[in-house]
From Swiss-Prot:
It comes from Geotalea uraniireducens (strain Rf4). HAMAP family: Ribosomal_bL21. Belongs to the bacterial ribosomal protein bL21 family. It comes from the Bacteria. This is Large ribosomal subunit protein bL21. The keyword DNA-binding does not apply.
Length: 102
């Protein structure tokens, strides 16, 4: 069985036992999180939401809270000797999908 969930403005296809790297979610390591924005549930019987599947949810456990690798943003103006270098590290959460409720 698999499901398509929406979190952090992105869509992910998940099944039970998968590890999922998403935008930061509130909670500590070991807490359970319920993702209620389920767009589709597949398996023996397919259910497609319009836009969401009613009474469907995905339960996951927070495995890790942290930051991604640093992304360097370099901006320059040609012929002006004007340069700017910024760095950014996005906060992220790693979930282990435990159960898909359909």
């Amino acid at each position: 069985m698999y499901a398509v969930v929406r979190t952090g403005g992105k869509q992910y296809k998940v099944s039970e036992g998968d590890f999922l790297k998403v935008e930061k979610l509130e909670g500590a390591v070991g807490d359970t999180v319920e993702l209620s924005e389920v767009l589709m549930v597949g398996g023996d019987k397919v259910a497609i939401g319009t836009p969401l599947v009613p009474s469907a949810s995905v339960v996951g456990k927070i495995v890790e809270q942290g930051k991604d690798k640093k992304i360097l943003v370099f901006k320059s103006k040609r012929r002006k000797d004007s340069r700017k270098l910024n760095g950014h590290r996005q906060l992220r959460t790693i979930l282990k999908i435990e159960k898909i409720n359909a």
